Structure formats: C-alpha cells, structure tokens
Amino acid sequence: MAPSADMTSLPLGVKVEDSAFGKPAGGGSGQAPGAAAATAAAMGADEEGAKPKVSPSLLPFSVEALMADHRKPGAKESSLAASESAQAAGGLAQPLGVPPGSLGAPDAPSSPRPLGHFSVGGLLKLPEDALVKAESPEKPERTPWMQSPRFSPPPARRLSPPACTLRKHKTNRKPRTPFTTAQLLALERKFRQKQYLSIAERAEFSSSLSLTETQVKIWFQNRRAKAKRLQEAELEKLKMAAKPMLPPAAFGLSFPLGGPAAVAAAAGASLYGASGPFQRAALPVAPVGLYTAHVGYSMYHLT
C-alpha cells in the first residue's frame, strides 16, 4: 500500500516545500505536491524492498533458518512441532537437554520442558529410589527405552544336548565267534607247536575243529599279536631289573687317592701354606701306589 501525501509531511509544521524531499534537484524553491507524494511513495517502496523477506518454505534446520533474525510466530510453532515429532520418532534429530526451539530461533525464549532421564538436571532431580537399583526381583527398575521392543534382549536359546561320541561299529560287522573250551585248547596247543600255518595245514586243522579257515586265520593273527605284547613286557621288566639303583661313580671319587693329582695338591698346599703369615698344617700325603684303583662302590666295604 503506497503512503498518502498527508503521511509524508514532516512534524513540527515543516512544509513539504522546505524539506529535502520537496526541493528540486537543480536548487529550485518549489515543487508540486503530486511530485512530492510520488517521491515519498518511491522511497517507501525502496525501504520495503530493502527489508529481508523470509521464505515460508525454509526448513527449520536449514542454514537460512538458523541465520535469519526475524521469524514469524507461525514458523516458530511449526519448527517446534517438527522438532518434537522428530525427537519422538527417532530421538536423534536433536541433542539431549537442548530446547526444541533453540536451534530454529536462537534469540527466541525457550519454553520450559520436562527434564529427560539422561540430562544433567534430570539426573540431579531424580529421587534416590530411582538411582538405587531395586533389591527385590519382583519390581525391577526399567527405564522407558529398556521397555521398548527394539532394546529388549533376545530370548535365550536352549542348548542342544551334545552328540554321542561313542565309537560306531560297522553295520556289516560279523558277530564274534564263540569258541568252545576244546577248540581253544587245541588252538593253543597248535600255536605252541607252530605259529604260522600253511594253507594246507590251516585247511586240515580247521576241518578237524569244525571251524572255517578264516576263523582259524584270524585267531592265529590275534594270538601272534598277544604273544608279541607279552614278549615286549618281559623285556621291559628285564631292563628295569638290570639297571642299578645308583648310577656308577655317583658318590665315589673318580681319581686315585695316591695318584699324581693328590701329590700335586699336597705339594701346592705345603708351598703356599709356608709362605703366608698364617701357616697351616699340610695334609698328610699318602704314599704313591696306595689306593691306586678308582674308589667306587668298594669304598662302602672299607673297615
């Protein structure tokens, strides 16, 4: 709306002709009232164009909305509703403890809002019953985010019983042959005579015992393996019995008492003992040839 001619008049009774707007550009003293009104209308239009225009389509979190100094009341309410809806939906659109309208309009006074559980004020104002964990299992303390199905722990899976680790036999395994006492005695007697049977001897011996050749063959194989194990056990026992209880020369001297080593040791002791300020009695030297043999286990039999 363009201003009228009465609105453009200056206060204190100053006429339009005497003001700067009424003077012509060439220094003339008079100007028509219509021209003055047109000039004032043009300047009013320029002032309105110079004012920043806020686009109604700005987002509440855009750079233009944050940098704008003047916001409309409707825009503030819309930004507040948008921020609250975003916080209720995801909880990540706005930092904790920050009022919803502070991001959209920095100079707008923020309305008081209830303190959250994780804000500083909320932690300070929580009662002691909420801070201390409930001891009774009937009423466990659970926060709202823990009650959400998104944060609920998955149900515990039941562990399946371990598989059986027993050895599985072949399905086509033949049953064990039940030998009679007479058959076992005959097989043992034949094994002591000869451990390896030829094909003809095995066929004749198996027919005499009413057994198959395969049964006689397998029995001889098992009997030879058993005899080998018994023989190895007997050899191990003989080796253990042959070993002495004490290792040789463990406690005996490995050098002769009357040898050159004893003579040299006695000579050195007498040499250094006589030269020192404190003389010590030299050890008696055994005559050469006495106890020339190495002293081993025989030293225990000396009387």
Swiss-Prot record:
Entry GO MF terms: cis-regulatory region sequence-specific DNA binding; DNA-binding transcription activator activity, RNA polymerase II-specific; DNA-binding transcription repressor activity, RNA polymerase II-specific; p53 binding; RNA polymerase II transcription regulatory region sequence-specific DNA binding; transcription cis-regulatory region binding
Record keywords: Developmental protein, DNA-binding, Homeobox, Isopeptide bond, Nucleus, Repressor, Transcription, Transcription regulation, Ubl conjugation
Biased composition (Low complexity): 32-44, 77-101
DNA-binding residue intervals: 172-231
Cross-link (Glycyl lysine isopeptide (Lys-Gly) (interchain with G-Cter in SUMO)): K15, K133
Biased composition (Basic and acidic residues): 133-142
A cellular-component GO term for this protein: transcription regulator complex
UniProt-annotated stretches for the region Disordered: 18-56, 69-116, 133-163
Subcellular location: Nucleus
PTM: Sumoylated by PIAS1, desumoylated by SENP1. Sumoylation of Lys-15 and Lys-133 not required for interaction with H1-5, transcriptional repression, inhibition of myoblast differentiation, or binding to gene promoters.
GO annotation (BP), single: positive regulation of intrinsic apoptotic signaling pathway by p53 class mediator
Reported function: Acts as a transcriptional repressor. Capable of transcription autoinactivation. Binds to the consensus sequence 5'-C/GTAAT-3' in downstream activin regulatory elements (DARE) in the gene promoter, thereby repressing the transcription of CGA/alpha-GSU and GNRHR. Represses transcription of myoblast differentiation factors. Binds to core enhancer regions in target gene promoters of myoblast differentiation factors with binding specificity facilitated by interaction with PIAS1.
Quaternary structure note: Interacts with CREBBP/CBP, TBP and SP1; interaction with these transcription activators may inhibit autoinactivation. Interacts (via C-terminus) with PIAS1 (via N-terminus); the interaction is required for the localization of both proteins to the nuclear periphery and specific binding of MSX1 to the core enhancer region in target gene promoters. Interacts with H1-5.
The family this protein is said to belong to: Belongs to the Msh homeobox family.
Protein's name according to its UniProt entry: Homeobox protein MSX-1
Organism for this UniProt entry: Callithrix jacchus (White-tufted-ear marmoset)
Lineage, uppermost ranks: Eukaryota, Metazoa, Chordata, Craniata, Vertebrata
Gene name of the record: MSX1
